[in-house]
């Protein structure tokens, strides 16, 4: 063991949820309309963007994943707004003396189009995290009809977070 404490930590997060009927389609705290009236299946609101960011934040500090803190076996988290969960995760991060340097996320979905909603997603996330929205990058792509996203069986998100130790 040494006494080295890094100034930066990076975390990677990933989430995917199945598209189903009878559920809302919440991404980045925005209720989107799928052309086939599909939503994301999950214990909470199944917000893949917010979930992948939470996992990236937790992973950067080796704190486990969101299932450790908000297990699907606990009815307390049933249908909960994922932005509420994100606020709890960022509190954990800040209690350890870290701050977000930046977030970069890629949503993978054939439909609906995500780009028109990116700015409001960034606003929702920046308000929850209490950071400038310029620290958040959100991109969207299709999977070119390949894999579960391409077959419109689900929507996924990859996120990377860079944390900086505060003095």
From Swiss-Prot:
Cofactor(s) listed: a divalent metal cation
Tree of life domain: Bacteria
InterPro entries: MECDP_synthase, MECDP_synthase_CS, MECDP_synthase_sf
PROSITE patterns found in the cross-reference section: ISPF (PS01350)
UniProt-annotated site: Transition state stabilizer, residues: 43, 142
EC number assigned by the record: 4.6.1.12
Binding positions for 4-CDP-2-C-methyl-D-erythritol 2-phosphate per the UniProt entry: 15-17, 43-44, 65-67, 141-144, 151
Binding locations of a divalent metal cation: 15, 17, 51
UniProt keyword list: Isoprene biosynthesis, Lyase, Metal-binding
Pathway this chain belongs to: Isoprenoid biosynthesis; isopentenyl diphosphate biosynthesis via DXP pathway; isopentenyl diphosphate from 1-deoxy-D-xylulose 5-phosphate: step 4/6
Keyword Lyase: yes
GO MF terms, alphabetically ordered: 2-C-methyl-D-erythritol 2,4-cyclodiphosphate synthase activity; metal ion binding
GO biological process, one term: isopentenyl diphosphate biosynthetic process, methylerythritol 4-phosphate pathway
Catalytic activity, as annotated: 4-CDP-2-C-methyl-D-erythritol 2-phosphate = 2-C-methyl-D-erythritol 2,4-cyclic diphosphate + CMP
Co-factor binding details: Binds 1 divalent metal cation per subunit.
Function: Involved in the biosynthesis of isopentenyl diphosphate (IPP) and dimethylallyl diphosphate (DMAPP), two major building blocks of isoprenoid compounds. Catalyzes the conversion of 4-diphosphocytidyl-2-C-methyl-D-erythritol 2-phosphate (CDP-ME2P) to 2-C-methyl-D-erythritol 2,4-cyclodiphosphate (ME-CPP) with a corresponding release of cytidine 5-monophosphate (CMP).
Family: Belongs to the IspF family.
Subunit structure: Homotrimer.
Designated name of the protein: 2-C-methyl-D-erythritol 2,4-cyclodiphosphate synthase
Organism encoding this protein: Prochlorococcus marinus (strain MIT 9312)
